[in-house]
Amino acid sequence: MKKTPRKVYVVDNGFVTSKAFSLSDNLGRLLENQVFIELVRRGYDVERTMFYYRSRNDKEVDFVLRKGVHIERLVQVCYDMSNPKTEKREVDSIVECAGELKCNNLVIVTNNDKRTIEKDGYQIDVVPISEF
């Protein structure tokens, strides 16, 4: 695995919004932070079981969840995938990382989208944050 820069998360989205200049520009980042908080609540640990990954072609996945030595799940976060270019970028990223990491349990967390996407033999569950 290639070493990547660490991402920084805060435990309270209220802190982020109080310091943000434009809330609309940060909705995706706030959603990603909310997913991070939920994963920590579920027991994932940033030092042992929860990672960020960048592929050989610079595609990224927000969360790689590990159980023991096995990759359990890949989680991508995207506030709004209504733009076809955005959807393509997010789907291509998670599929490429899934291939490199040999993981079939893929999810994209969104603000309110719910569906299943199939690409290159992978099934990706798209779920709203309220159901994550």
Say what each PLM segment does:
Residues 111-132:
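Domain-level recognition of nuclease-like catalytic cores that cleave nucleotide substrates
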Residues 1-71:
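Accessory nucleic acid-recognition modules appended to NTPase machines
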Residues 82-92:
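Active-site-adjacent loop/helix micro-motif of nuclease/hydrolase catalytic cores
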Residues 15, 57, 79-82, 113:
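Short, glycine/serine-rich, charged loops/turns that create anion-binding
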Residues 41-45, 93-103:
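Arginine/glycine-rich "motif VI" loop of SF2 helicases in the C-terminal RecA-like domain
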Residues 104-110:
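Short, hydrophobic beta-strand segments that form beta-sheet elements in well-ordered domains
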Residues 71-83:
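Active-site ExK catalytic segment of metal-dependent nucleases
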